[in-house]
């Protein structure tokens, strides 16, 4: 009887061990199998006119020849390869079926980026020092993302004939504005019969797209005199490598713009970069600089 009980205990032990081995060997595979099929994104925020391509992966392999569907084709449509096109402000669900299971990506479409960008040309006051610059362009970005704005300014003569065009890209951080300095020298139309033309400028917005922000900070030192000049040191810093053009606008005690200059700065990550800005001591009263604003673009 004792031998029989011992035999039963041995059999139970062997069975338990076998079950433990099966759990160790099989269960992780089942868990992995349940997790390895997934969409590249389950939530996407797009702006009208933008595209995004969804992918479905089975493990590390991309699944092809799928049938994608949109719950609201007026807001966002999707083609046979999973490319989403944002059409109108609203919400939509992009669905794909694979191995009898549905996978869903929630899409939020916001207004077109261009709808929230404004721009204008501003004359620089004649009594303000501006070097070769005679215009400022103010670009306002009311989007909740940083944008790259492509703007053209066409120049015409007094009779409306085209002279030249200047096209530039400007980066404007979210919910802010920049002021860039523009150079438009007056010139001659006909070299054989020189005729001065009056400037007529027409500005147009070509495109707006999302981009990385310009994360540059700056500190301006108190003015100091050196060899007949008044200087200020501008120290730039950034947590990541950044480079940008910048406009410096100086105002007097009455709030009038008295001096504008431009520059370029390259800032390595977590380093301090110093620029020295100065003018002759004879212009101290003329400029009467009490406030300085710097705009990066």
Give the role of each language-model region.
Residues 44-50, 126-131, 223-226:
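Short, solvent-exposed loop/linker segments at the N-terminal edge
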Residues 78-90, 133-137, 228-235:
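Strand-loop-strand motifs at the edges of beta-sheets in extracellular beta-sandwich domains
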Residues 139-143, 235-240:
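Asparagine-centered strand-capping/turn motif at beta-strand->loop junctions
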Residues 90-94, 149, 244:
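Exposed beta-strand face motif in extracellular beta-rich ectodomains
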Residues 7-29:
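Sec-dependent N-terminal signal peptides of Gram-positive bacterial secreted proteins and lipoproteins
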